[in-house]
Structures are given as C-alpha cells and as structure tokens.
Amino acid sequence: MRYITIEGGTPLRGEVAVQGAKNSVLPILAATLLSGDMCRIEGCPHLSDVDSAADILRYLGCAVQWDGDDLLVDSTTLTRCDIPQTLMRRMRSSVIFLGAILARCGWAELSYPGGCELGPRPIDLHLAALRALGADIDDAGGTLRCRARRLTGCQIVLATPSVGATENAMLAACGAEGETVICNAAREPEIADLQAFLCAMGAEVRGAGGSVITVSPKRPLHGCVHRVIPDRIVAATYLCAAAAAGGEVTLRNTEHRHLAAVTTVLDQAGCGVRCGEGYIQLVRTGPLRAVPPVRTAPYPGFPTDCQAILMAALLQAQGTTVFVENIFQSRYRHVPELARMGADIRTEGRVAVVCGTERLHGTEVVATDLRGGAALAVAGLAAEGVTTVQGIGHIQRGYADLAGDLRALGARITEQ
C-alpha cells in the first residue's frame, strides 16, 4: 500500500499551478456521448476518477486517449448502453452517465455507483428528474433499468440544489423534444463549465450559475475543443496548507471568484490574501486565530469539500472554531485521525468543535476518504516530527500530484 510521509515544521514558499477541475471533467466526459463525434477536453488532471470515467467510455464503445494533459474522446460509435457494477462502483459520480446514455440511446442499464463513504447520498433526485422527462425507471435489485422511447422537455423542480441531479437533468434534456427548465438548480462553477461545453457542441443551454437553467435542444450536436476550469477545491487545499504551515504561496491558474467563501474565512483567521486575474496569494506570518462558525452550504456558500481541509488548518488557531456540516451526515471520519496527532476536536451529530492546541505531533494516520486524506496531509505540514498518511488511493482520486505540488512549495514530503 502506497503512503505519504511528511516532515512538518517547514513554511511553504513559492508558486504552483492548479490542476483542472475534477468535478468539471467527469460530467463533461459523460457529455461527450451526446456529440457522436470527436471532442478534445483540455487541461484534464491525471486522476484515478478520470481514468475510471475514461474506462466507462471505452466500455461503451468510445475511443479515448490521452494527449499530454488533454483527453480525446471519439463517441461516433456506441456499442453498449449498459455499465457493469465493476466500473460503476469505482466512483460515486459514475451515475452522471445515466442521463447522457439515455439521451443518446433511449435506454440505459447501470448498477448503483460507488465512491467515498460519506453517509447516505441517494440518487432519488436524479431519478425524479429523468422520470419528469419521460423515462421509465426500474431500480429494483440494485440495478437501474431505464427506458425512454421519447424524452419530452418539461419543468423540473429539484427538492434540493443537487449538483449531480442538475447535471444529469441537463444532459438528458439535450436529448429531449422541447424546452426543459430546471428550477432550484445547483449554482456551482462546474455547472457553468458543463453549460459552456454543451454550448460548444451546439446545444442551447443558458442560466447556469443561477438557480434556473433552460435547455432548448438543438440537434445534431458536434465535437468541440474545451478547456476545463481550475479546480477550486485543490486550490483551497493549497491555501489551507500554507495557512497551516505558514509562509507565502502564490497559486496560478485559479479563479479567485470561485473561492470567495474560503478566502474570506482564511482572511478572518489572520492570513493575508491577495487575489488577481488568474492568481491567489496567501501570506501567513503570525499565529492563526479562531473564526466564526463555519457552516457548509451549496455554492456560493462554504463548500463541504473544504470542511475537513480548513479544520486541519485551524487545529492550532488561538480559540475555538465551530463547524456545522449541512451537506453530508458522515463527514467527520477524519476527526479520530486528527486526534491521533494531538488535535482537540469534539463532535456531536453535524457539529464539530475545534479547540486550538499549541502542538501537533506526527504519527501514522489513515485516509478514510478523499478530502479527509488531504486534511491529514495539511495537518502533517504543521505537526512536529514525521506524519505518515496511509490509504492515499483516496487522495489520488482528486489530486493529480499532491506530494509533488507541496514539495514544489518547499514541503518535506515524499510519496512511496
């Protein structure tokens, strides 16, 4: 089993470029099925989740190949409209292929998806959206059997602004007859990036970034070239790493407007944050201080994917910080591992109370999920001694080269 070793206590300094957004790449790869043509997706991060999505496309009959950091997908010919359990269980977001396959083929058969265990994450909203468009779905026995002789545009009102359900509805609506209006849509930047890709293929989609998205199908769609947006969660991770370790770090290839909720909190914690076109700079020279309660929320609120990472950065802050996890029920699995390093954290239900401690000590810890694993690495940068993070397969689902990027900033970190 591979692991990361971190020798803490070294401030971070320098510049690093942020990878493309994983949460943009995955739905965009699913969307290539709608083109029936060649698409080039530029700036794709080399991640295990991206490899899993590429393997799904190959299984369906697409030709997929890497060209540097670009992925070329030729979906001219589909030979299958089903995805087996072995592929579906490799990542949670594999369910995003459902809407695209249904729009292209008129039927789809998928098992339930896998991914990080963060408590119940039902796909009921996805299925309700597809049923509203006219799909007949049988979800008995752990397999989704979906048929739609004809998808029909309609108004879809999501009970909550689910990112995945919004994306699935957008993709399926591209194959429907008539206009579809998605209300209470997720507003994440990755939704706007998916809209940009669909429009580049010739679709008429508008409203992404707001709570109402309208899809007016145009066929046939065609291939295109598209560059994905920077990964805001990776950028937030490196900002939190610099906050934890101290120093001065500049991130290139990033969009500071997507990170306002995170940079605001880091500023409250005592970091100096300066933003400009394509970059964010963070300076931390003095001690960190506790911040007002951090409540996770859909975008533009504080992202749930940054909760564990910010918590790790504030373990030594002066005072007490309260975290309230409003998105997932089981997203404090990293807390026992941080406690092994000397963190003072109490949890009850959706609430975690972090009392700043003077010292963290390195030890052996285990990543239990993607962002929790990144949080352990952030804590290791601030700890005294050596921290070993096991289970880095979780981390590699979302970070193309976490160790390499941190090493470029001066961290004493190795991957073995």
Describe the predicted segments one by one:
Residues 1-416:
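Short, structured segments at the rim of ligand-binding sites
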